[in-house]
Each structure stands twice: as C-alpha cells, then as structure tokens.
C-alpha cells in the first residue's frame, strides 16, 4: 500500500521548539560534553518508508488483514524534533516546504539513499538480567534431553538463580546495558525487561533496580516487569503456596511502592505455577495497580478464560492453545506474543499456531524472548525470519507484529510502533531496498542506524 502524506513541517513545529535547532557541529560538541543530545533530524531519500499508518478507525491492536497494512511511502522523508516525529511524507514534498527550505542547514540531515526505514522494533518479551549462559543445558539438549528433563536435573531457570543472587547490582546493570546496546544495533528501540532469576525479595528488587539503572543510561525505552513467579525456587520445593504468598505479599507490594515495575508476569505451565496460583498473583498485582501478562501454553494447554478477566496486556508463547480459547481471545485486545526463537533453539518441530491465531482475528506480536536458556537471541529480524519460515507469517505481518502490535502488548501504542506525527522518534534504517529483505537475510544484521527518542545510535558519519 502506498501513501503520500502532505509534508507540512512548519505547521507541525511548536513555536517554543524552533529556537532549539542544532547544526551538525553543535551535535558533535554536545556529544563530547556527554550531554543528552536530541538533534533535529531530517531523514530523506528513503526508498521505502514503512509508516504502519492504519486505515481503520477502530482503536486497538492490529488483527487479521490489518497486519498487512504497512502504509509504505516510496522516496519518503521524516522530520524529528525534540525526540518526536513531527512530519512524514515524500522527500519531494518535504523539499518544497518553506520552513525546511529556511532551516535546512540547521537540521541534521541523513540521506538514506534508497534504504528502508521503519519504526524501531518493540521487543515485548525479554529476560536480560542474568550472569552466565546455560551451556550445560545446551549440550544436554543436543544429547536428547527435554526441557522438563533438564529442569528436573537442576538445569533450566533455576540454574541461573545463583549467579543473580550473588552478583552485585553494578554487574547486573552493565550486563543489561550491554544487552540493550546490542538490541539497538539490530533496530530495537523499546524493550520489555523482566526480572525472574533472583526468586527472593532482595534479588528480584535488585534485578528490577538493575533494569531501571541500565534504562537511565540508554536512549531507548525500557518497560520493567516483575517475574517473581518464574519458577518455585529450590528452598520452597514442595511449598509452592508459601512462595506464591511471598510473591503476593512482599514482592509485588515492594515493586509497586518503589515504582520498579509496570507489569507483573507469571509462568503458568507444568513445572511452574498453576492457573489458580496465577490468578492469586494477578489479584495481588491488580490491587497494587500493576498491569499483568503471562507465560502460558508453552509446554501444555492452559484455559485462558480465568486470565482474561484481568485484562492482561499479553499472553506469551501460546504454543498450545485450545480452539475455544482462540475464539475468546479474538474478542479481546489482549495480544498473543509469539516467540519462535525459543522453539528454534529448543529444536522443537512445532511452532506457535500463528496462522490459526491471525486468521481467527487474534492480535499477534513477535518478540525475541531473549534469555540464557531457551532463546539467546537479541535480533528481532531473526524472530521475524523464523515467523515467516516456520509460522507462515508474511513479511508484512511480521513487521506489524514486531512494531505496532509489540507496542500494544506493552500499552505504548499511543507513543510507539508506527511512524506518525506526534509519536516518539524511534526509527530503524536497514541497508536493503525492500522491506521483505529484513526477514529474508536471516542470521545477518542489515540495520545501519537506529534512532531512539530522537537520539542517533550507530555509525551515521556517512
């Protein structure tokens, strides 16, 4: 679908912002002084500008055929001021604009030379707070051990706990910051980051503080999630109700009081928490005004009805889902967040039923599920490639699921996930000539520039 939006820059710029325009030398000097810089950016000569502008007037996440509406502008242009997108259209219209003619030398201009520009990816499911990779699990899986067998032998999630419990917060902050930087290099600008490898009140709060501190040093956007209910720690084995009580009465209230999390997550599956326990945790989260989300259906079917009454932002994994639950989910705005990287790395033959969900009208998002055990990938393009090849999503559906629907899964769609005036200036520039190449060139990184809240990330000297 092609669009030609009228590029009326002058009308979009508030008067108080006009005197803050920076030229290139100003940007360079401010960078040297370590001040936060949001240069006024003009991206021009974009081969395909993927706006994700939507023709439907009905609010809510993309579903069905709406996932294929990319709102492509050929030879596009974008102007960003003060960390926001203010105008979108064709380069031809932009260069005619009187305001840009007058101020062009004061704006940091990026010639995209026919490359593809799209909204920064929204990775709505990650586990970045850990210390070491799970190499033993990797080898055991190669030898034929299942997820459940590895967990029963002391591997899996519990094997990451000791490292987080003993690590200093500074170590965790630097770890998370490195992850965020690597994600940005692949075009990701918004990240949901979970705790979940501490499993004590102290270690879960330390993990959330590490996320907060790392986020303060990264120009992108980070949404923190308390995942105290990841698994039952070994000291509570056989006493799951007591651990759930700890999560509900201590972890959740403290995370809410300290404003360390926006969401509470729970892993509801065999070997983790029951649906009844998940409901108890959701009740506690709701009482403390925290939104909820859940890992569900990764290993076995779980009835979704009890979860939906809490209006979860997303239900994630969804490998095993019943027909009646699909029909029910299609009547809600809860997003089904699919993480094919986990299925790939676990060597599974089956993948989440994306086609069935999409065709039924369920809103679907894609995420990396970045974690040390089952999906150690930072790359949203790789997640998209797996979605196309193993879940039969089209490239257009993959892009929408990785951007605007990811934003809906984090309840950030008013700010993130599309290239439209008024939204945050989050952009990814890919050195390809067609958007379909992004999932096509799997295992490579074609992202050459990322813009996060108006700040440049990458080698933009050329």
What are these regions (language model features)?
Residues 46, 78, 83, 114, ...:
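Divalent metal-coordination and catalytic microenvironments
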Residues 101-175:
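Metal-associated gating/positioning segment near the N- to mid-region
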Residues 38-47:
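Conserved N-terminal strand/loop that marks the beginning of ABC ATPase nucleotide-binding domains
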Residues 42, 106-111, 224, 450:
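Conserved beta-strand scaffold positions in the cores of enzyme catalytic domains, especially
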Residues 17, 21, 28-38, 52-117:
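Histidine-rich, glycine-flanked metal-binding segment
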Residues 155-176, 181, 189-305:
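Metal-coordinating catalytic core of metallo-dependent amide/deamination hydrolases
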Residues 184, 248, 256-257, 308, ...:
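Non-catalytic positions within long, well-ordered alpha-helices that form the structural scaffold/packing
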Residues 291, 301-418, 430-436, 442-444, ...:
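Active-site-adjacent C-terminal substructures of enzyme catalytic domains
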């Amino acid at each position: 679908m092609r669009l030609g939006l009228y590029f009326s820059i002058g009308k979009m710029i508030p008067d108080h912002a006009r005197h803050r325009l920076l030229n290139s030398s100003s940007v360079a000097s401010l960078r040297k002084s370590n001040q936060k810089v949001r240069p006024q950016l003009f991206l021009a000569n974009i081969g395909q500008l993927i706006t994700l502008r939507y023709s439907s007037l009905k609010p809510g996440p993309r579903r069905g055929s709406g996932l294929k509406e990319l709102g492509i502008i050929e030879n596009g242009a974008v102007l960003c001021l003060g960390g926001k997108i203010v105008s979108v259209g064709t380069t031809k219209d932009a260069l005619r604009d009187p305001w840009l003619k007058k101020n062009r030398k004061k704006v940091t201009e990026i010639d995209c030379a026919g490359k593809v520009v799209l909204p920064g990816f929204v990775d709505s499911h990650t586990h970045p707070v850990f210390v070491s990779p799970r190499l033993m699990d990797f080898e055991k899986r190669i030898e034929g051990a299942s997820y459940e067998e590895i967990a029963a032998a002391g591997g899996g999630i519990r094997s990451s706990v000791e490292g987080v419990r003993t690590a200093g917060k500074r170590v965790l902050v630097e770890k998370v910051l490195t992850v965020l930087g690597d994600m940005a290099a692949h075009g990701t600008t918004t990240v949901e980051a979970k705790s979940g490898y501490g499993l004590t009140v102290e270690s879960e709060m330390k993990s959330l503080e590490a996320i907060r501190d790392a986020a303060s040093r990264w120009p992108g956007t980070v949404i923190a999630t308390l995942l105290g209910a990841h698994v039952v720690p070994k000291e509570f084995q056989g006493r799951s109700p007591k651990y759930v009580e700890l999560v509900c009465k201590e972890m959740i209230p403290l995370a809410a009081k300290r404003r360390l999390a926006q969401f509470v997550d729970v892993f509801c599956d065999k070997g983790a928490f029951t649906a009844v326990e998940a409901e108890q945790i959701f009740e506690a989260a709701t009482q403390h005004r925290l939104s909820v989300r859940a890992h569900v259906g990764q290993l076995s079917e779980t009835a979704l009805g009890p979860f939906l009454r809490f209006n979860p932002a997303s239900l994630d994994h969804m490998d095993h889902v019943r027909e009646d639950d699909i029909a029910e989910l299609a009547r809600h705005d809860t997003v089904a967040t699919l993480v094919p990287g986990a299925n790939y790395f676990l060597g599974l033959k089956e993948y989440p039923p994306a086609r069935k969900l999409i065709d039924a009208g369920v809103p679907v998002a894609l995420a990396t599920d970045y974690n040390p055990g089952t999906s150690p990938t930072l790359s949203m393009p790789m997640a998209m490639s797996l979605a196309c090849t193993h879940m039969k999503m089209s490239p257009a559906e993959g892009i929408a699921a990785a951007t605007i629907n990811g934003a809906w899964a984090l309840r950030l769609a008013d700010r993130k996930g599309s290239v439209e005036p008024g939204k945050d200036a989050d952009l990814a520039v890919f050195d390809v000539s067609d958007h379909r190449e992004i999932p096509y060139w799997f295992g490579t990184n074609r992202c050459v520039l990322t813009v996060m809240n108006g700040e440049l990330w990458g080698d933009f000297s050329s």
